[in-house]
Amino acid sequence: MVGVIVLGTLATSAAGCVINDLWDRDIDPFVERTQARPLASRALTVQTGIGVALISLVCAAILALYLNRLSFWLCVGAVPVIICYPLAKRFFRVPQLVLSIAWGFAVLISWSAAVGELEVATWLLWGAVVLWTMGFDTVYAMSDREDDLRLGVNSSAIFFGDKAANAVGLFFVGTVGLLAAMGINLHLHMGVWMAISAAAIVWFLQYSQLRKVDIPKPVYGKIFSQNVWVGFVILAGMIVGEIF
């Protein structure tokens, strides 16, 4: 089951990334951070991109057939969200929320596949993932703010304006609160509390950086990348907390 979930996640993530680049291929060349992407730079053709996306989706669909009924239908529900996310920036003022919900499906699908149902702790973890994603992807959007304003596309960084750093801080505080609530609900032990504490410290330091004036653009990317490792720490803590 773990193998199915991991491979399915990789296939879905690959499809989502390619679909995003397909939708944005006429925008990405004019954004400093994304202008070197294969479709934006014309290193890959649109036909190749569509082919990769379809193959990835087919692989994900085949793997979904090995899941229970609830998990399968959650996979089906995730597809339109993943496909529509890149369009959200054109019509919705906070497109990062759509991305956050898309990421949240990973929690719902994995949990239901393992347990067979969605529990209180499931929704607490789902909420934590949604808020966490809102936080780190708002940071990512802060590096593109000038380009997005010029191109007329939306982002949470633009929506929150000069309060974006405070919004990120609140998202991270909410994430810590929901993770703690999940830990209490599941009676997890020392491992998860150590992981949550470590994550909280990192997020506080990141928030402190974002509060500074005239932040170099590479800092936003660095903070975004740090959250990958924060995720691994939290995952490890949850595993240790469940086992011991």
PLM regions with names:
Residues 2-9, 25-75, 150-190, 196:
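Multi-pass membrane catalytic core of lipid/isoprenoid biosynthesis enzymes
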Residues 181-244:
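Extended hydrophobic alpha-helices typical of membrane-associated regions
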Residues 15, 56-59, 81, 128, ...:
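Membrane-embedded alpha-helical transmembrane segments of multi-pass integral membrane proteins
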Residues 1-4, 70-78, 82, 96-151, ...:
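Functional transmembrane core segments of multi-pass inner-membrane proteins
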